[in-house]
Structure formats: C-alpha cells, structure tokens
C-alpha cells in the first residue's frame, strides 16, 4: 500500500536550465526511487525568490524544470510533482520552525557565507533562513530519504537538527531525514573548466552541460573541456580528467570507460579521442530528454494539470503534519 512505503522528498530551484549535476546528483535517483518509495518531488519556487527573478522568467523556469523532470523519466502517475508555493502549509510550518532556528547557526552555514561573499548587496532574511525552509519542505511530508547532490549534505544535517529540536521540545513528530544516493557517496559533478567548482545553473555556461543543449553545443563543450598535457604512467589522475571519467561512467559503456582508464594508466591516453567519444555518448543520452522536454513545454495545459493534482496530494499529507505540529505546540484553542 502506498502509505506504507517510506517517504521521499526532494526539490530543485527554478533558477536556470537543468544540467548534468542536477541530473546525476538528484534526478537519476528520483527515477529509481519512484519505483520503491512514496515520492514527493517539487519545484522550489519560493527558494528561488531570494534573487528576485522577474515574474515572466520565474514562470518559464518553473514550467521548464517540471518538463525536464518528466522528460528525464519521472512518471506523474507514480510520484507527486508540485510547486512548493502551491503548498501553503509549508509556509506556516516554516514560521513555527523559525522560532527554533538560531541566528548564529544560520550565519555559519557555508552556502549562506558563500552568498554573502558573492552578493553582499542582497543578504535578505530569506537567504539566512533558507535551510529552515528547506528542512520544512522535507519534514512536513515526514520524509526519511532525500535524494540530493553533495552540495546539499550540510542542509540535510540541519534538517535533522531541527527535527530533533522540535521533537525534544514538543514531542515526537518528525523522523530524521537522510541525504540519499544509490551509490556510496553523494555526487558532485565538477564544471568542465578544470577549476574545481561544481557545475551550476547560472555560472560558466560553456563549462556546464545543460539538458537543453543542442547536439552541437554538447560536442563543442566537451571538446573544450579541460584535460592535462598527457598521462605519465604512475602519476595520479588530475581532477579534471577524473571528472570526465566520472561523467563518462554515467553515459558511456563500461568497456569504453575501462579503455580510457587503462590508456591513462599506460600513459597513452589521447584526450581528443576521449572527448569525441564522450561527446557522442552524451548526445545520445541528452537528445531524447531535450526533445521530450520541448514537447512537454509546448503543452502547458498538461503541465498545469500535473502540478495542480500534485499540489492537492502534497497538501493532504502536509496538512496532517501541520495539524499535529500546531497541537503539540499548543496552538489548538478549540
Ligand atoms: P539546486 O536547485 O541547486 O539543485 C538541485 C539538485 O541538484 C543537485 N546538484 C548537483 N549534484 C551534483 N553535482 C552538481 N554539480 C550539482 N549541482 C546541483 C543538488 O544537490 C540538488 O539535489 N536547496 C536545494 C533545493 C531544495 C531542496 C529542498 C532539496 C529546496 N528544498 C528539500 C531537497 C529537499 C537546491 O538549491 O538545489
């Protein structure tokens, strides 16, 4: 029965085009999890408001993220897909949870410190309390597993802290959620420029492969990917090459990967060949997703229907948790 399955929650901010990091850090897990778990996947539109997007861009981005999730293999019949802002219960629990979140701990969050450094002119309260909202997204559905990339690990730790803090003060309500990946470790896909940063929606477009890239863009970006000057037998693999091998493992056959790993170890690797091969395998992987996503975006009526039905389901489960939270806190006067 659906209610007996473990609950899973994850979200993606609609702040730009989805890329390989989003796919391999998160969406790939969603697709497998939909068969085994009771999954709630949402577009984190409130979270994206910290950067004040213009309303038209916001709407286009929300619809695209939804379309790209479905095009990647999420089945709206199996999972609950919704926009965060369509579940107002989240906002109330966020208000309640903010009373248990301390300024000091929020200021110490690495993602907050990064934002303060990158956008000192826009350090708003939403940014500071971002991890509280994210925790509530998860806790309100009483999720136990949260498929995310490595960059979200710290936020998950905070979600566990908030769950514990609430449970200790008011009584047991929230399970403690864990970050989840089918492999051993959480995934971090690096950008192709070899500078060590992660692929991200809004930075360095030439070093990021998007699910919406054309075949030619994919080939071109991979041709330009950073490698090194050539393997020397016995030398450790540079990070930029290791990242390409990791990406190759995701889209190429095991034999192809092994061939290039062996060539690296033997000092005979030809990076041009490797990048051409990876380009072709990547095109095969991305082009069906891109085409399906385009077709879905041409049918906004369908996407709206999915979102609406998803929000209705997500609200039922969220409302139950919220009511229990109100009761435990003592906000039940009649
Ligand atoms: P966001 O929108 O930045 O990213 C969506 C998902 O993609 C993963 N990801 C990556 N994984 C590996 N390598 C990369 N280069 C890479 N870049 C992104 C992210 O880890 C994430 O899983 N705060 C979240 C959104 C959110 C959320 C939630 C997630 C809001 N509420 C509740 C889970 C549960 C974020 O900004 O993700």
Regions picked out by a protein language model, each given a short descriptive name:
Residues 2-136, 294:
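N-terminal Rossmann-like or analogous alpha/beta NTP/dinucleotide-binding catalytic cores
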Residues 114-166, 170, 191:
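Internal, conserved structured core segments that host functional sites
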Residues 103-107, 140-147, 252-260, 290:
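Short helix-capping/linker segments at secondary-structure and domain boundaries
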Residues 69, 151, 196:
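Conserved RecA-like P-loop NTPase ATPase core
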Residues 12-14, 45-47, 144-145, 203, ...:
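Short, histidine-centered active-site or binding-site loop motifs used for metal coordination
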Residues 22, 154, 160-334:
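Conserved nucleotide- and phosphate/pyrophosphate-binding catalytic cores
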């Amino acid at each position: 029965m659906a209610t007996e399955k473990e609950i899973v929650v994850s979200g993606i901010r609609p702040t730009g085009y989805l890329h390989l990091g989003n796919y391999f850090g998160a969406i790939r897990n969603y697709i497998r999890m939909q068969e085994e778990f009771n999954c709630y996947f949402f577009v984190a539109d409130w979270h994206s408001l910290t950067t004040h997007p213009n309303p038209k861009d916001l709407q286009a981005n929300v619809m695209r993220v939804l379309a790209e999730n479905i095009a990647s293999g999420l089945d709206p019949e199996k999972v609950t897909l919704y926009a965060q802002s369509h579940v107002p219960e989240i906002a109330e629990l966020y208000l309640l949870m903010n009373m248990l979140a301390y300024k000091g701990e929020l200021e110490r969050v690495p993602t907050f410190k990064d934002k303060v450094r990158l956008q000192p002119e826009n350090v708003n309260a939403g940014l500071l309390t971002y991890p509280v909202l994210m925790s509530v997204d998860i806790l309100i559905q009483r999720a136990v597993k949260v498929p995310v990339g490595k960059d979200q690990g710290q936020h998950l730790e905070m979600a566990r802290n908030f769950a514990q803090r609430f449970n200790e003060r008011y009584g047991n309500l929230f399970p403690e959620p864990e970050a989840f990946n089918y492999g051993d470790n959480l995934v971090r896909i690096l950008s192709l420029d070899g500078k060590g940063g992660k692929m991200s929606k809004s930075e360095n477009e030439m070093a990021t492969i998007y699910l919406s890239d054309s075949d030619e863009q994919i080939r071109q970006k991979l041709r330009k990917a950073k490698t090194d000057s050539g393997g020397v037998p016995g030398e450790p693999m540079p990070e930029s090459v290791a990242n390409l091998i990791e990406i190759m493992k995701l889209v190429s056959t095991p034999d192809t990967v092994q061939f290039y790993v062996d060539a690296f170890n033997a000092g005979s690797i030809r990076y041009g060949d490797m990048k051409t091969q990876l380009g072709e395998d990547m095109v095969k992987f991305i082009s069906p997703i891109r085409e399906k996503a385009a077709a879905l975006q041409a049918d906004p009526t369908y996407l709206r229907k999915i979102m609406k039905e998803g929000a209705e389901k997500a609200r039922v489960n969220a409302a139950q948790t919220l009511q229990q939270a109100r009761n435990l806190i003592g906000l039940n006067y009649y």
